[in-house]
Amino acid sequence: MSRKRSKMSSSGTISNYYVDGVMAQEPEDVYAPRLIQASHTVTPRPSGAGDNADFSSCNFAPKPGVFSSSWSSVHPQGIYHPYVHHHHQPHLSATDGRYVGVRPWMEPISNHVSFAGFHPSNTRPYGAKPDVLPAKVPECDTLEPEARPVPAEFSCGGALGAEKVTKEQRRASEISSHGEPKDEKQQLDPNNPAANWIHARSTRKKRCPYTKYQTLELEKEFLYNMYLTRDRRFEVARILSLTERQVKIWFQNRRMKMKKMNREKGGKDQL
């Protein structure tokens, strides 16, 4: 067997492409007039039956055109598909080109692609290039754990598991925070209300202690004047970022503390 590379031309829209064909074992002098010269120039020949007549020994089967009358010169055999690759099936290289029946005894092509532009009756399977489209990423549900190990926090169920853990922690913290009041309520004796004051909780608001800076400024103001006018009280409250009521209460408490200290001091002097 000998491999011959020939350059063919057609009168249609597609021309000047190469065809690798496996020719039958015959003397070279039979195909000598058909070989292309070194100048690579070939006179155009009529397409269709004329081309098939030159290769009558290969049993070419002519097929009707698939397009309108203006496209009658182009046959399905002449359509070149860009996805046909020669190195996948080197012994069937003739199937990529114009002539189909070079090696009819060969095995059929495993991968086929159907073209929407052809009529179903005139369609011919073409060798498809494998792995043309990128592989689709499998979903998390269908992915096997052995195929792709992923940490638990980054897996599909990791987020749900983290949410469940946080919810459980919140519930545990709520139970622990509210556990003492429940125990206290259980310890209360409805039959003995006099003993309930031991476990009673204070309803007073928590004290809002003044900062050291605020206390120092209020002490200075108190030493300067034990009683503040309303205007001065508003001014001090504005400077110290306090309310007028807080300044008023602090001065009242400071005066009561001073009176108590004076009484204690007077009692010691009498003794």
UniProtKB/Swiss-Prot annotation:
Tell me which InterPro entries the record gives: Abd-B_homeobox_TF (IPR050803), HD (IPR001356), HD_metazoa (IPR020479), Homeobox_CS (IPR017970), Homeodomain-like_sf (IPR009057), Hox9_activation_N (IPR006711), HXA9/HXB9/HXC9 (IPR017112)
Q: Which GO terms describe its cellular component?
A: nucleus
UniProt KW DNA-binding keyword: yes
Residue ranges the UniProt entry marks as DNA-binding: 203-262
Disordered: where is this region?
A: 161-195
GO molecular-function terms, A-Z: DNA-binding transcription factor activity; DNA-binding transcription factor activity, RNA polymerase II-specific; RNA polymerase II cis-regulatory region sequence-specific DNA binding
Basic and acidic residues: bias regions: 164-187
Q: Where in the cell is it found?
A: Nucleus
Source species, domain of life: Eukaryota
Give the principal location in a single coarse category: nucleus
Keywords attached to this Swiss-Prot or TrEMBL record, sorted alphabetically, are: Developmental protein, DNA-binding, Homeobox, Nucleus, Transcription, Transcription regulation
Q: Which PROSITE patterns match?
A: HOMEOBOX_1, HOMEOBOX_2
| The keyword Acyltransferase is assigned to this record | no
User: Tell me, what is an example of a GO biological process annotation in this record?
Assistant: regulation of transcription by RNA polymerase II
The record's comment on protein family reads: Belongs to the Abd-B homeobox family.
As for what it does, the entry says: Sequence-specific transcription factor which is part of a developmental regulatory system that provides cells with specific positional identities on the anterior-posterior axis.
The name under which this protein is listed is Homeobox protein Hox-D9
Q: Which organism is it from?
A: Oryzias latipes
